[in-house]
């Protein structure tokens, strides 16, 4: 009798152990399942500084995906920018340019209006008429981004002291009041974003940065003014960052990288917090 009960007790313990192992395996599998998917579009041509950033980003984002448990894909095939393809992704990234095809533009607009997430870097907001990138997309440049057309930029790429203007936004709530950026070519825009009620300016260039730029043209050195560099549109789940232009040795024609955008801890933190906010929320 004693042996019978002892065997039953051991069997019960084994069953309990198996159930516990199965439960922990299920939980572990759930935890290892990527929480959301990110797709980055890029062109990878023309400006060596933009190409440098594109390569840097396509090495950095997969590392962050493994660390923060999301999936990162990238493509230079802009034909993928359609409703069916985008339906598999929570966040879209434009690394170095924008869309030109009307059908793709409409697909992106609907994706954003339906709650998709977007992060755009540097040249993705560029528009100048006349140029190869004219301002011929009013929804994107005037409503969505709010910035209008490109007006001018600093040169050479230099670091700036940046001021965080809103600590309530998910991407900036963990940032200090001010921080030093990675070197960048900074843009000025035709529209005053402060006058747009839909735009929330998140980060701007602090006045302690002036003079900003080294020239040689005087117009490439900023001595005063107000320059937003990161903002969001409150109607959409989006964030634009003017960063994304690495410093390249053009002067000596070696074309070597002299700086990298994603070696700045504060800019990295801002990007990751934005991705996690966009990716983990409901679409």
Name each model-derived stretch.
Residues 34, 87-88, 114, 167, ...:
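Residue-level preference for short coil/turn positions at secondary-structure junctions
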Residues 98-174:
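A glycine-rich, often tryptophan-bearing local segment used as a flexible ligand/cofactor-contacting loop or short
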């Amino acid at each position: 009798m004693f042996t019978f009960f002892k065997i039953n007790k051991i069997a019960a313990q084994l069953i309990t152990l198996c159930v516990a192992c199965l439960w922990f395996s299920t939980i572990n599998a759930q935890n290892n399942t990527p929480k959301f998917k990110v797709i980055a579009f890029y062109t990878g041509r023309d400006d060596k500084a933009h190409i440098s950033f594109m390569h840097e980003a396509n090495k950095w984002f997969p590392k962050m995906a493994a660390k923060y448990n999301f999936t990162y894909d990238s493509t230079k095939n802009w034909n993928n920018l359609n409703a069916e393809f985008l339906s598999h992704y929570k966040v879209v990234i434009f690394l170095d340019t924008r869309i030109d095809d009307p059908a793709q533009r409409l697909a992106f607009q609907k994706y954003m209006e339906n709650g998709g997430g977007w992060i755009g870097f540097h040249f993705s907001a560029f528009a100048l008429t006349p140029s190869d990138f004219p301002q011929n997309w009013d929804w994107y440049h005037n409503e969505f981004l709010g910035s209008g057309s490109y007006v001018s930029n600093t040169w050479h790429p230099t670091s700036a002291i940046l001021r965080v203007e809103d600590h309530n936004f998910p991407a900036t709530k963990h940032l200090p009041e001010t921080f030093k950026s990675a070197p960048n070519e900074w843009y000025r825009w035709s529209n005053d974003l402060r006058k747009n009620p839909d735009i929330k300016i998140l980060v701007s260039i602090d006045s302690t940065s002036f003079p900003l730029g080294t020239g040689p043209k005087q117009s490439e050195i900023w001595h005063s003014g107000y320059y937003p560099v990161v903002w969001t549109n409150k109607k959409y789940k989006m964030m634009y960052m003017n960063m994304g232009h690495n410093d390249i040795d053009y002067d000596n024609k070696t074309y070597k990288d002299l700086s990298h955008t994603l070696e700045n801890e504060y800019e990295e933190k801002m990007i990751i917090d934005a991705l996690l906010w966009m990716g983990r929320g409901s679409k």
